[in-house]
């Protein structure tokens, strides 16, 4: 029986992870195998989802919920700060200059919950502060070193991961500290190690940094897994009286009235106030740079960047200042417009009569209808173009708006499939420049505008191109493109009064194009049952025959009127002649 082979561990290669990270960074710079595009202030950043999820709790939670999103727009983060964090994610190096730039990167790291970047910024802040004074005799003044604070995470537009605040502090209280384990590093060694750091660099292991080592020492003391014991003056060491002693400590939490964050210790609460909200001059560290704070008048949210403040206001006002030059769609952000322009196709130069196909440049989906393509784009842009004017709500899809109107306001939209509709003209003083055409309508009865008063008229819409029908509305920009495909014919019926007071029935057929006759009509659906209505389709022969019949009827009416006029004259002359004959005859007695 052969002896069992034992698994032996070969030599470790600590540089392997660095080589992998360098290769991933090269692929990112060359845009190879990237599966996510991040839009920050209109700038596109290519990256890998797996790398982002490994370095950020924010992206880890987001990619779990939205797995198929190839394009994500992030608000509340500046382009400069996000570029630094992307470089740190792929190179483990963080190069920043100035306090203002450091504050922006800090805010972005808190937003994205990148703990390693926050630790690196803490190291930088400690290096810029005054060096620690080495004193072997010790001091009575308490010293605190804060590692990281990640609870102040802003989640404005995207959901963030739910995590407990991470805060590690070391307090050297008044009195003496006795350590019985010789293998534990002292605070002086940690301080000297921290002063030797000259370049902010993370190698992927938290134990390599001095602050992480300090946190490790502190956690070992608190957990009691070492032989080291910390004795506090005034606290009993007897286990029996320890429970009674712990009752003397207050269990009340300290709450920040500004950001509603809670702390178990008063010292941590005061340090939070000094770092983020209050200072001797009433100005926090984040407000030292002299930036103006912009406050939203609707929701009282604060912004230190005016550009972010303006974009936020458009959510309340509904303003959309950026317009697409091709399809005239409007957007609230310029970055959303740029994303729309990459996929917008107007069909200019295409042959008439050929169906235009619209391809999405993000996911390569193809649509044969502009309405379907436009509804698909909002999935990538996140825009909500459908607006309810009754309750000021916005919806992403048109069917969501229709469902809302039906459920909330009891307004149901009837789909027009009949071919005969009854409409009335709207008398206005200003010139009319548009006409409503409803899909699948063969004939519409209207009263003509700018004509003599008549009884009725008939308007026929023929050869309506499908691209002209967008939500039952024809746009003027498309009218000029297809002048030969839409024409309107209407039959004018009138009565002409002759000099003798007789009314003559006259009919006249008119054929004009839509773009040459501006008409505006207000459609009203028939209340009767239109299912049994038979559509009337007028072809060219029927028009000619109706025109000939109208002319013939007018001629006959005119002849009848002349006959009625000449007949009384003949009768009167005959009676006169008869009377004269009677007077000329002799009277016989």
UniProtKB/Swiss-Prot annotation:
An example Gene Ontology CC term for this record: nucleus
Localization in the cell: Nucleus
Motif segment (Nuclear localization signal 2): 283-294
Superkingdom per UniProt: Eukaryota
Pfam families from the UniProt entry: BTB, zf-met
Keywords: DNA-binding, Isopeptide bond, Metal-binding, Nucleus, Repeat, Repressor, Transcription, Transcription regulation, Ubl conjugation, Zinc, Zinc-finger
Region Disordered, annotated ranges: 224-247, 539-589
ZnF segments: C2H2-type: 254-277, 294-316, 322-347, 358-380, 386-409
Subcellular location, principal: nucleus
Stretches assigned to the BTB domain: 34-98
InterPro entries linked to this entry: BTB/POZ_dom, SKP1/BTB/POZ_sf, Znf_C2H2_sf, Znf_C2H2_type
Keyword Repeat listed: yes
Residue stretches of biased makeup (Basic and acidic residues): 224-234, 539-583
Glycyl lysine isopeptide (Lys-Gly) (interchain with G-Cter in SUMO), cross-linked positions: 567
Protein family (similarity comment): Belongs to the krueppel C2H2-type zinc-finger protein family.
Biological role: May be involved in transcriptional regulation as a repressor of ESR1/ER-alpha signaling. Plays a role during development and organogenesis as well as in the function of the adult central nervous system.
Name used for this protein in its record: Zinc finger protein 131
Organism: Pongo abelii
């Amino acid at each position: 029986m052969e002896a069992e082979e034992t698994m032996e561990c070969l030599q470790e290669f600590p540089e392997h992870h660095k080589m992998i990270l360098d290769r991933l960074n090269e692929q990112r710079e060359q845009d190879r195998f990237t599966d996510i595009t991040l839009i920050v202030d209109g700038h596109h950043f290519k990256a890998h989802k797996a790398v982002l999820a490994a370095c950020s709790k924010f992206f880890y939670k987001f990619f779990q919920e939205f797995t198929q999103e190839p394009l994500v727009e992030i608000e509340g983060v500046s382009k400069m700060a996000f570029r630094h964090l992307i470089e740190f994610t792929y190179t483990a190096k963080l190069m920043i200059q100035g306090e203002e730039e450091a504050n922006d990167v800090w805010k972005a790291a808190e937003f994205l919950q990148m703990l390693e970047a926050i630790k690196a910024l803490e190291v930088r802040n400690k290096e810029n502060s005054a060096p620690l004074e080495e004193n072997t005799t010790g001091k009575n003044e308490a010293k605190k070193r804060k590692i990281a604070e990640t609870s102040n995470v802003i989640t404005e537009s995207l959901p963030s991961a739910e995590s407990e605040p991470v805060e590690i502090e070391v307090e050297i209280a008044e009195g003496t500290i006795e350590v019985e384990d010789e293998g534990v590093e002292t605070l002086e060694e940690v301080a000297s190690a921290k002063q030797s750091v000259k370049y902010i660099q993370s190698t992927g292991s938290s134990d390599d940094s001095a602050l992480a080592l300090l946190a490790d020492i502190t956690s070992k003391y608190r957990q009691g897994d070492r032989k080291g014991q910390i004795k506090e003056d005034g606290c009993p060491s007897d286990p029996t009286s320890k429970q009674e002693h712990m009752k003397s400590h207050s269990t009340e939490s300290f709450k920040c009235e500004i950001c509603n964050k809670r702390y178990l210790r008063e010292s941590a609460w005061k340090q939070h106030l000094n770092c983020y909200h209050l200072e001797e001059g009433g100005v926090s560290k984040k407000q030292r740079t002299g930036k103006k704070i912009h406050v939203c008048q609707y929701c009282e949210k604060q912004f230190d960047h005016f550009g972010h403040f303006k974009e936020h206001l458009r959510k309340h006002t509904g303003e959309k200042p950026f317009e697409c030059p091709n399809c005239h769609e409007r957007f609230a952000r310029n970055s959303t417009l740029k994303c729309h322009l990459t996929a917008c196709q107007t069909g200019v130069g295409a042959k008439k009569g050929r169906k235009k196909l619209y391809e999405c440049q993000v996911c390569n989906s193809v649509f044969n209808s502009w309405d379907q393509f436009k509804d698909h784009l909002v999935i990538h842009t996140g825009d909500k173009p459908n607006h309810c004017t009754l309750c000021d709500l916005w919806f992403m899809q048109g069917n969501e708006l229709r469902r809302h109107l039906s459920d909330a306001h009891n307004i149901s939209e009837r789909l027009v499939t009949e071919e005969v509709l009854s409409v009335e003209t709207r008398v206005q003083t200003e010139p009319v420049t548009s006409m409503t055409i409803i899909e699948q309508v063969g004939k519409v009865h209207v009263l003509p505008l700018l004509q003599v008063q008549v009884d009725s008229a008939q308007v026929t819409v023929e050869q309506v191109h499908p691209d002209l029908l967008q939500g039952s509305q024809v746009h003027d920009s498309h009218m000029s493109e297809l002048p030969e495909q839409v024409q309107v014919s209407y039959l004018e019926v009138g009565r002409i009064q002759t000099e003798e007071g007789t009314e003559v029935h006259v009919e006249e057929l008119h054929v004009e194009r839509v773009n040459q006759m501006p008409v505006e009509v207000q459609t009203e659906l028939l209340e009767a049952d239109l299912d049994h209505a038979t559509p009337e389709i007028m072809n060219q022969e029927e028009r000619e025959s109706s025109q000939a019949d109208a002319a013939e009827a007018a001629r006959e009416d005119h002849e009848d009127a002349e006959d009625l006029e000449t007949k009384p004259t003949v009768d009167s002359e005959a009676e006169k002649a008869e009377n004269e004959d009677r007077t000329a005859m002799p009277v016989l007695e």
